[in-house]
Amino acid sequence: MTCTILVGGQWGDEGKGKCITYFCTQDKPEIIARAGVGPNAGHSVEFNGEKYGLRLTPSGFFNKEARLLIGAGVLVNPEVFEHELEYLSKYAVEGRTFMDANCAIITDKHTKQDKDSAYLSKKIGTTGSGCGPANADRINRTIDYAKDVPELEKYITDVPSEINKAIDEGKDVFIEGSQGFGLSLYYGTYPYVTSKDTCASTAAADVGVGPTKVDEVIVIFKSYITRVGEGPFPTEISPEEAEKMGIEEYGVVTGRKRRVGLFDKDFAKRSCMINGATQIALTCIDRLYPECAKVNKYEDLSQEARDYIEDIEENVGVPITIISTGPDLADTIDLRNEKLN
């Protein structure tokens, strides 16, 4: 039984939703915990032919046996939280979705400040979700916590106690981060970053898990890179080149068109170093090599695709254990047994 953390290795939009869905289907963790900044990041999840866009609820919600927890490090907008409970009602998330008492609360004041700031909205490219101003208030110790909001009382639990008890009992725990390494307040392309760190160590702290309790850190990369908003992007290609490659993507929260670039092995190596990666999940290989769409055996990938994957693995120095070849759960090559045992 393991405690696993999954975080993004680039600038977000790496395909965390699909991979989390896969892990939570295959491994069936008893607890799925949400770490990260807050509702400024969207996870796209496809399950049973339906697509969901989530901003707070853990992406493994479809596993009806799992408890879904939101760690104290995560900012909560009660309106977004309530909306997602209703939105996902067919999966019986009510009664098994809880947040820590110390989650800080985003209010209309914070979202207004975010949207009204020309610096944040135009220069930095904020999503307008209120996370930056809310984290500023948190640092100044002027923000309300979930325990201060009567309407949230029935959703409050002691997240660190629940998770650590589960780990001590030998149960599987899955912790999902949000956004990506390049957006880290500490290690990203400052000032074009989010309002806190996005690395695996912070994800563990967000939910109250000490570093010695973590068994696996999976860093997820897209086979190419995308970025929403402003900021340095060394391997960026022109929209015309991206169009020739057949790549056109839009952000889940903002709807803004994503910038596109080539895979950056040096950036990936640094991302894996700082995150302490034990595994890599690589997504969207089918976008670069369309002949690999829906392949679920490594030997059935084209030689060109295999060479591409093996070159990344050799240069980054971390085993690539999961390869996504399409949006469906079946479109996955799982090499964990071969590479980790």
Swiss-Prot record:
Mg(2+) binds at D13, G42. GTP binds at residues 12-18, 42-44, 258, 284-286, 324-326. Keywords: Cytoplasm, GTP-binding, Ligase, Magnesium, Metal-binding, Nucleotide-binding, Purine biosynthesis. It is found in: Cytoplasm. The keyword Nucleotide-binding applies. HAMAP family: Adenylosucc_synth. It catalyses: IMP + L-aspartate + GTP = N(6)-(1,2-dicarboxyethyl)-AMP + GDP + phosphate + 2 H(+). This is Adenylosuccinate synthetase. Plays an important role in the de novo pathway of purine nucleotide biosynthesis. Catalyzes the first committed step in the biosynthesis of AMP from IMP. Its EC number is 6.3.4.4. Signal peptide: none annotated. GO terms for cellular component: cytoplasm. CDD domains: AdSS. The keyword Signal does not apply. Binds 1 Mg(2+) ion per subunit. Substrate binds at V252, V253, T254, G255, R256, K257, R258. Homodimer. It comes from the Archaea. Belongs to the adenylosuccinate synthetase family. GO terms for molecular function: adenylosuccinate synthase activity; GTP binding; magnesium ion binding. Its cofactor is Mg(2+). It comes from Methanosphaera stadtmanae (strain ATCC 43021 / DSM 3091 / JCM 11832 / MCB-3). One of its GO terms (biological process) is IMP metabolic process. IMP binds at D13, E14, G15, K16, N40, A41, G42, H43, T127, R141, Q179, T194, R256. Pathway: Purine metabolism; AMP biosynthesis via de novo pathway; AMP from IMP: step 1/2. The active site is at D13 (proton acceptor), H43 (proton donor). Pfam families: Adenylsucc_synt.
